[in-house]
From Swiss-Prot:
Keywords: 4Fe-4S, Amino-acid biosynthesis, Branched-chain amino acid biosynthesis, Iron, Iron-sulfur, Leucine biosynthesis, Lyase, Metal-binding. Belongs to the aconitase/IPM isomerase family. LeuC type 1 subfamily. Binds 1 [4Fe-4S] cluster per subunit. Catalyzes the isomerization between 2-isopropylmalate and 3-isopropylmalate, via the formation of 2-isopropylmaleate. This is 3-isopropylmalate dehydratase large subunit. GO terms for molecular function: 3-isopropylmalate dehydratase activity; 4 iron, 4 sulfur cluster binding; metal ion binding. Heterodimer of LeuC and LeuD.
Length: 469
């Protein structure tokens, strides 16, 4: 019987299935960070249980770490406690961890792939919503809760019910100035934040296959914002080439065997999906969110929508509330919106490809950050990304233009550290969520690509980067 990629990943990890469909799945890799792991480790200690498979776990602090000078440690006592607790727990249980001042430290969903700890055919979990990122490698990856983190630590298994299959097929040549971020925002704009509820989404088509692994990770990262349990892309030569020679990747003869095994992780030609959504890449335009949900998105050459034109009363009320919170008027041209702050970073867009794209725009425009921009910051996704960017001189491109070049971490993606918006401040952000208060109480978030964020920093308002040439 023909199988989808999701079917294959699921079926190769089933330990046992109950009559009601509840399935015990084997988990190949668990990634840990400081926010959702303390209670899990405490549960193990209270029950006097060991970690079942120590080598299957990899930990890093990312949510609470400062992105400025780290020589004085962490100022906030709560943040410091969480980071110190992860350090102590990993030391006690023997789990590999990249501590705050380790060059390999970074955002958990960036360090996993760059270390080769994320591999095709794996089941991967983490106590974090955006674990779907790792599905870009032909893996089944999704976020879990703290009690489930403990369960995986203790048993290397997880109770799950199988999702339905969805294929999002994007075909054609992506226009100049458009990126993976624009693709996924366009997808969410089309199907909505509940469009993927109950599904695991496979992203396919010629446009997706043409993306780099960085681009594929951006798309899969935001599958959760479409309501999906997981997002994934089939294995191909791009996948294999990215993983070759990475520290956790198989080596020698084992590498050859692994590559042969990975080749199966793609949907069979005649596999059936429960839902298929198609997009024409040629019609995708640089995207900007205007509201308080990723589905509230439009093109850079568009206008803020008018709630009065929405027939659905529930949607109309949501639009009115969003516009009030965002302090925007209906029919306002998107290009006239002026951010106060610029954030280039997060597990969505803080890889070397993203940093290069933003730097290219800054060099192309050849000017400094606009006077109305209070802060423009670039936060690399890991110490290794930061080091690579510095070898290429990209840090100088930013700092000479008036940007701040920071240390790696989750930073302004969420208000859980020192990097945050003040009430009423507006931010052009390359992150994944624009909910009320996400970047700070009363903060207003517009989700965009790194290139779009960089252009807004220089021009002082959103601009259509397709015009840069």
């Amino acid at each position: 019987m023909a199988q989808t990629l999701y079917d294959k990943l699921w079926n190769t990890h089933v330990v046992h299935t109950e009559e009601d469909g509840t399935t015990l799945l084997y988990i190949d890799r668990q990634l840990l960070h400081e926010v959702t792991s303390p209670q899990a480790f405490e549960g193990l200690k209270l029950a006097q249980r060991p970690v079942w498979r120590i080598s299957a776990n990899l930990a890093v602090s990312d949510h609470n770490v400062p992105t400025t000078d780290r020589s004085h440690g962490i100022a906030d006592p709560v943040s410091k406690l969480q980071v110190d607790t992860l350090d102590a727990n990993c030391d006690a249980f023997g789990i590999t961890q990249f501590k705050m001042n380790d060059l390999r430290q970074g955002i958990v969903h960036i360090i996993g792939p760059e270390q080769g700890a994320t591999l095709p055919g794996m089941t991967i979990v983490c106590g974090d919503s955006h674990t779907s990122t790792h599905g870009a490698f032909g893996a089944l990856a999704h976020g879990i809760g703290t009690s489930e983190v403990e369960h995986v630590l203790a048993t290397q298994t997880l109770l799950q019910k199988k999702s339905k299959n969805m294929l999002v097929k994007v075909e054609g040549q992506l226009p100049h100035g458009c990126t993976a971020k624009d693709i996924v925002l366009a997808i969410i704009g089309k199907i909505g934040t509940a469009g993927g509820t109950g599904y695991a989404i496979e992203f396919g088509g010629s446009t997706i296959r043409a993306l780099s692994m960085e681009g594929r990770m951006t798309v899969c990262n935001m599958a959760i914002e479409a309501g999906a349990r997981a997002g994934m892309v089939a294995v191909d030569d791009t996948t294999v080439e990215y993983l070759k020679g990475r520290p956790f990747s198989p080596q020698g003869v084992e590498w050859d065997q692994a590559v042969e095994y990975w080749k199966q992780f793609k949907s069979d030609p005649d596999a059936q999906f429960d839902r298929v959504v198609e997009l024409n890449a040629a019609e995708i335009v640089p995207q900007v969110t205007w509201g308080t949900s990723p589905e509230m998105v439009t093109s850079i050459d568009g206008r803020v929508p008018d709630p009065e034109k929405e027939k659905d009363p529930v949607k109309r009320d949501a639009m009115e509330r969003a516009l009030h919170y965002m302090a925007l008027e209906p029919n306002l041209p998107i290009e006239s919106i002026k951010p106060d702050k610029i954030f280039i970073g997060s597990c969505t867009n803080a890889r070397i490809e993203d940093i290069r794209a933003a730097a290219w725009v800054v060099k192309k425009l050849g000017r400094r950050v606009a006077p109305n921009i209070r802060l423009a910051m670039v936060v690399p996704g890991s110490g290794l990304v930061k080091a690579q960017a510095e070898r290429e001189g990209l840090d100088k491109v930013f700092t000479e233009a008036g940007f701040e070049w920071r240390e790696p971490g989750c930073s302004m993606c969420l208000a859980m550290n020192a990097d945050r918006l003040e009430p009423g401040e507006r931010c052009a952000s390359t992150s994944n969520r624009n909910f009320e208060g996400r970047q700070g109480a009363g903060g207003r978030t517009h989700l965009v690509s790194p290139a779009m964020a960089a252009a807004a920093a220089i021009e002082g308002h959103f601009v259509d980067i397709r015009k840069l040439g």
